[in-house]
Amino acid sequence: MRTWQVNDVMTTAVVTVGQGDSYRDVVDLLVSHRFSAVPVVDDFQRVTGVVSEADLLRKIEYAGAEEPRLFDGRRRRDERVKASARTAGDLMSAPPVVVPSGTSIPAAARLMDGEGVKRLPVVDDLGRLVGIVSRGDLLKVHLRPDDEIQADVEAGVLRGVITDETNAVRSTVQDGVVTLTGRVDRWSTTDIVGRLTRQVAGVVDVADELEFDYDDRNILGTGVAFGIA
């Protein structure tokens, strides 16, 4: 079964800044493009940091503020440094949170959620920038046509699991919801089919209406079929 990856949905036309670009140039870029952040790259297109609107606003926030105090915490000291920054290299947050291009879409979504970010720079094996992926990009998988989703379920799930001709399973898809009907030999087969179907890109939900001849949950012990996380 093919797993959709970040490089399937990312935006490849990426606007960047260099570490030496001026504060005003960065502001102009964000305002003119209506971006909330921009990646900073070196001469080899490796991502070295990210400058966000929040980083730029430190200059306004600390304008005319009193001198740093001895007991100021590290976060406040860092903010003061950004308030006096003149270049993207001094403004940027580093190290950047990036995602490899071959990362699965669920893994990228978990990373965004865990880091509290709305978009991620996408890098290749050498750390070079190859794209940007946003929350909206990740949601593109749910715009897949129903017939494409059904084809993946049939080829990637049913033909791989249902090898016995006596196990007849049918699938239909409407608005991303997959309905599985038919009869198989045991409960564990229905569990595996259902779990794999939920992993198909674009599946909104699975209506599992499969019937089975033998309930093997007690034998398995956990009520979860082996081999599926």
Task: Annotate each language-model stretch with its function.
Residues 1-33, 43-46, 50-229:
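N-terminal targeting leaders
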